[in-house]
């Protein structure tokens, strides 16, 4: 009963979009597709119309025709929920999954038959996930515990794949010089992807799913809490006081495609001595954001507003073309202050008359420290290289005053200082200041 009452809203959205393009189609379609190919096809029926068209002789038999049949699929799942376990506590959950693929096939038409020649599938995949078990694991430009775990996971995943294929691991002849099962070397994509995923999400390599695609999305969350205002000490000090925490992560596969060599002979080894994989993947990406890790938003009894927050995020990407891992890490610390001075007035003379202008003066100040760096890690050599990064101090001050309901003025001062992580870039300081006058026409 308590669980049912705390759930305020649940949303489920599933969208599937399919499309086909069949070039070389000759007959007239008739009014609204009532002739050919068929009325169900006009309304989205996605059965293999190309074979029916070939059987009925609807396709061109021009010798130099080389356009491709294309079939596209886009499947998107969105799940949302809003929970309120207590009056002062709100939790919002959100998870997503998206799968996109495009099948392209070269063909020719012979009398009464559609003849497929070469087919290739390309696509992208993204799903919300969770990496919080490794979020605070030691990692810098010199070393990374998760990266070392990734390298250690490869032998575990390789042995699981070999056992799944029925390879006798007790026979030394079935192992390569590094101790990996033959066909599942340390640089095989089928080995690298689960090992990478397990290491950076904190999962056990013995139990992680061996396939590249993940089935069910893990929700991101945003938590807001204002219950401290119930305490007498907080009531006496603050007009409002709230805490916010947010987290989200995602797992993505970019630019996967059909392995045409696998289609020819699935059991043949490639030049590196590995079994061929059904699909070839370019990059695997894990993205994590604490947005924010913690945020304090308060207003004191004297009208002073205070905001402080810490943000962290990281992006880990492995290139399966060269087996390099790229890690981007960001940290941001921000403090904001605001104060309103009420009813500041001064006299002005307008059109021969003395006019008293009275309005509030709003003051805002923000200061932030932001650090980020990008490291490329080599799986074969102990060689970590910082390729980009900087430490930045940011400051901003504004003061705005409304002279009337149409006219307002803003004074601003912006300051930034950046020191770069690589020696070829010089430190940079930027200062911007000025006055903005804004008039609104009714």
Which residue ranges define each predicted feature?
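Exposed, low-structure sequence patches enriched in small/polar residues
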Residues: 1-442
């Amino acid at each position: 009963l308590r669980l049912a009452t705390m759930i305020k809203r649940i949303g489920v959205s599933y969208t599937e979009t399919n499309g086909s393009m069949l070039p070389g189609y000759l007959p007239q379609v008739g009014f609204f597709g009532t002739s050919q190919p068929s009325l169900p096809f006009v309304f989205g029926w996605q059965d293999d119309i190309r074979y029916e068209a070939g059987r009925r002789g609807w396709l061109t038999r021009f010798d130099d025709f080389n356009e491709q049949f294309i079939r596209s699929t886009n499947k998107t799942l969105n799940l949302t929920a809003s929970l309120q376990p207590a009056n002062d506590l709100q939790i919002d959950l959100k998870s997503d999954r998206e799968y996109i693929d495009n099948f392209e096939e070269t063909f020719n038409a012979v009398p009464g038959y559609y003849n497929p020649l070469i087919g290739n599938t390309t696509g992208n995949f993204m799903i919300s996930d969770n990496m919080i078990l490794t979020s605070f694991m030691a990692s810098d430009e010199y070393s990374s515990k998760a990266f070392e775990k990734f390298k250690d996971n490869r032998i575990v995943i390789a042995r699981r794949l070999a056992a799944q294929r029925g390879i006798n691991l007790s026979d030394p002849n079935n192992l390569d010089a590094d101790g990996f099962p033959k066909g599942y070397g340390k640089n095989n994509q089928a080995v690298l992807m689960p090992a990478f995923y397990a290491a950076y999400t904190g999962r056990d390599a013995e139990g992680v799913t061996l396939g590249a695609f993940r089935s069910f999305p893990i929700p991101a969350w945003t938590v807001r809490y204002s219950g401290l205002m119930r305490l007498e000490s907080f009531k006496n000090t603050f007009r409002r006081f709230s805490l916010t925490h947010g987290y989200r992560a995602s797992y993505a596969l970019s630019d996967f495609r059909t392995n045409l060599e696998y289609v020819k002979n699935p059991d043949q080894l490639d030049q590196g001595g590995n079994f061929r994989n059904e699909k070839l993947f370019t990059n695997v990406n894990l993205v994590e954001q604490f947005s924010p890790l913690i945020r304090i938003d308060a207003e004191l009894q004297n009208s002073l507003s205070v905001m402080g927050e810490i943000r962290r995020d990281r992006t880990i990407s492995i290139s399966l073309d060269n087996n390099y891992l790229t890690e981007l890490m960001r940290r941001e610390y921000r403090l904001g202050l605001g104060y309103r001075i009420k009813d500041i007035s001064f006299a002005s003379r307008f059109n021969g008359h003395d006019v008293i202008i009275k309005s509030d003066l709003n003051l805002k100040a923000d200061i932030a420290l932001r650090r980020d760096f990008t490291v490329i890690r080599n799986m074969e050599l102990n060689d970590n290289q910082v390729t980009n990064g900087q430490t930045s101090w940011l400051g901003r001050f504004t003061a705005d005053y409304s002279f009337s309901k149409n006219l307002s003025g803003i004074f601003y001062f912006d300051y930034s200082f950046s020191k770069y992580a690589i020696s070829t870039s010089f430190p940079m300081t930027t200062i911007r200041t000025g006055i903005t006058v804004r008039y609104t026409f009714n």
